[in-house]
UniProtKB/Swiss-Prot annotation:
Keyword entries, A-Z: FAD, Flavoprotein, NADP, Oxidoreductase
The record's free-text note on cofactor binding: Binds 1 FAD per subunit.
Record text on subunit structure and interactions: Homodimer.
Organism annotation: Listeria monocytogenes serotype 4b (strain F2365)
HAMAP family according to UniProt: FENR2
Name this polypeptide is given: Ferredoxin--NADP reductase 2
Cofactor dependence: FAD
Coiled coil: none
EC number in record: 1.18.1.2
Residues given in the record as FAD binding sites: E37, Q45, Y50, V90, F124, D286, T327
Stretch forming the signal peptide: none
């Protein structure tokens, strides 16, 4: 059987942190594994949107850079040599007459005995700055993603937004930029209290409650932004080198909504086995929902083994759902 017709035990749709850990765990269960990822690299949103940001709620890490966490997860699964298909967006998943699944992407067709969906928040794109002239500076010095913190060294930076991402980026940029301002339309920030406390103690200029109303530049780069006080008359112009927009992201399930799965809003409904409404298809991570669900990477790390163990039992009912501990497997 060649690679194109090979039937894998487990195919994981989504190569973010939960998908990577699921691949490792499936390898420990001696499963043949394939990861299908729509982006050009593994890591999901951590690698694409926040590679330089620190994550503070991963067990065993007081703080870990997002890309470092991804690199460690890739290293962890490497001994099991999973097959990886990058830049392949899955269009459909259909159960065949023989009980296996046919997974069709824009590039290829894959086959699997069971499927684990770890697609995070689905397809996503940033909420953009809706101002005249802004679009021409996107990709120049208006940014929605930060891949390299060092590029802002010695520069004057303004960050717009009031959530965790905006506050975290402002605090990280303070260490490298010559000056940082954060602009938010409300007086109160929505970020974690600890981060807001650090922000208030920092040298960052806090511009609240203000919104950007105008961007000014020379056609090649943005040079100034005009701020307007919300429900007030105060106007202020900032001279800046970079403008970072953190208005959040718009996500959608994309083709997943057409796969016949039970959905609740933008999530896939699962039971205590992490099983969807279609037997043989399981979920883990932010893509799934159940009563009491908490959307954290750490939660997804716990859900992945549950999904894998039950998928293995689906493939072969003689297989134990509760496996040996990893300390025994690697001795």
């Amino acid at each position: 059987m060649d690679e194109k017709t090979k039937i894998y035990d487990i195919t994981i749709i989504g190569g973010g942190p939960v998908g990577l850990f699921a691949a490792f765990y499936a390898g420990m269960r001696n499963a043949s594994v394939k990861i299908i990822e729509s982006l050009p690299q593994l890591g999901g949103q951590l690698s694409t949107l926040y590679p330089e940001k620190y994550i503070y709620d991963i067990p065993g890490y007081p703080a870990v850079r997002a890309q470092e966490l991804v690199n460690n997860l890739i290293q962890q699964m490497k001994p099991f040599d999973p097959t990886i298909a990058l830049e392949e967006a899955v269009q459909s998943v259909e159960k065949q007459v023989d009980g296996t699944f046919e997974i069709i992407t824009k590039k290829d067709t894959h086959y699997s005995k069971a499927v684990i969906i770890t697609a995070g928040n689905g397809a996503f794109e940033p909420r953009r700055l809706d101002l005249p002239e802004a679009e021409q500076y996107e990709g120049k010095n208006i940014h929605y993603f930060i891949n390299d913190l060092s590029r802002f060294s010695g520069r004057r930076v303004a960050v717009c937004g009031g959530g965790d991402s905006a506050v975290d980026w402002a605090l990280m940029l303070e260490k490298v930029a010559s000056s940082v301002a954060i602009v938010h339309r409300r007086n109160a920030f929505r970020a974690h209290e600890h981060s807001v406390n650090n922000l208030e103690k920092s040298s960052i200029a806090i511009k609240t409650p203000f919104i950007p109303t105008e961007v000014l530049g020379n056609g090649d780069k943005l040079t100034h932004i005009t701020l307007q006080e919300v429900k007030g008359d105060t106007r202020e112009t900032l001279e800046i080198d970079d403008f970072i927009i953190n208005y959040g992201f718009v996500s959608s399930l994309g083709p997943i909504k057409n796969w016949g799965l039970e959905l609740e809003r933008n999530s896939i409904v699962v039971n205590s086995k992490m099983e969807t409404s279609i037997p043989g298809i399981y979920c883990a991570g932010d893509i799934c929902t159940y009563d009491g669900k908490v959307k954290l990477i750490a939660t997804g790390f716990g859900e992945a083994p549950t999904a894998i163990n039950n998928a293995m039992n689906f493939i072969d009912p003689k297989t134990r759902v509760q496996p040996m501990h990893s300390t025994s497997l690697f001795e």
